[in-house]
Amino acid sequence: MQFPNLNLHIHSNYSDGKQKISEIVKKSIKLNLDYIAITDHLTDSWKAWVSTLNNKLTISEYLEEISICQDYLISNNINLILLKGIEIDLSSTEQFIKKIVTIDEFDLILFEYLQTYETIAYLENIIHYWKTQIKKPLSFPILGLAHFDPSFFMLRNLDILMNFLKKYNIYFEFNSSYPSFYSPRYERFFKRIKEYQIPVAIGCDSHNQNNLNDYDEPLDMIQYYNLERNLELFINTLDLRVF
């Protein structure tokens, strides 16, 4: 199967990225990307300084800017799918996340710092809350793990993690900015990803235009671990969401 060119982890100047959303879109067109997601940070933790997305007004402006770019792509018949995303820091307070995120406004949500069993329980509580807020089940966003470090769970019980990811259809991100997290030392982890049929996708964690298309190595590693079917599962979910 010929896989599309994916980068579902991009930061703009709404957080710690260097470019405007419109500049990212224009460059992505030139690079022949097929799918991109703008996923700026949302946090009230120690790293709150990195993001302006700390109130509903700014989030509304952020989403509107993405909408304008989406309309441009559609009206000009450009074959680039742009997703409205966000990257949520799981060391943020539960109150902040629940208050500021209107779940059906987003196409894709990444979670960073899922590091313990306690964090799984914390995130599951938030997902349950979101599911009570959603008006149409089909409008629930795609969920993924940003630059996930498998090491904690590798030393303990992988089944708890895998069952959680399977239950909520949360994908694993092969992130080209963190290649150590998909190195061969984690081969046992990726065997479980394959066994549990956990979706996988690609994100570059791009903060400037220089690495918007750094998807070759992640794709090579997906093939190395024989996870092509897992990537197909993700693309099928993505297409259902988009089309």
PLM features: what roles do these ranges have?
Residues 1-12, 21, 25, 101, ...:
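Charged catalytic cores and adjacent phosphate/nucleic-acid-binding surfaces used
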